[in-house]
Each structure stands twice: as C-alpha cells, then as structure tokens.
Amino acid sequence: MKSKIALSCEKCKIKNYKTNKSIIERLELKKFCSRCKEHTIHKEEK
C-alpha cells in the first residue's frame, strides 16, 4: 500500500515536495529547495 508523504528541507524546514512511497524506511533525497536556492537533503514528513 502506498502512503502519501511530504518532503521537507533539512536547512529551512519548508515542505517543498509531496510524493507517494511504498517502502517502510524513512525517505531521504537530495532535491532543489526554492527558498535556499540550492540542492539540499529533504527528509520525509507525514
């Protein structure tokens, strides 16, 4: 079953991306943050 999650920037804590995931582990991706204007680590938020 896929669950809906939000990805938030580790630096500024803004929620930039929404996605679905089907794995159990917490998701952590390097994505572009529009507020920081750079690629940062984005972690999963519920």
Swiss-Prot record:
Organism: Mycoplasmopsis pulmonis (strain UAB CTIP)
Gene3D superfamilies: Ribosomal protein L33 (2.20.28.120)
Keywords: Ribonucleoprotein, Ribosomal protein
One record GO biological process: translation
Ribosomal protein among keywords: yes
Assigned protein family: Belongs to the bacterial ribosomal protein bL33 family.
Protein name per UniProt: Large ribosomal subunit protein bL33B
SUPFAM superfamilies (alphabetical): Zn-binding ribosomal proteins (SSF57829)
Keyword Ribosomal protein: yes
GO cellular component entries: cytoplasm; ribonucleoprotein complex; ribosome
GO function terms (MF aspect): structural constituent of ribosome
Domain of life: Bacteria
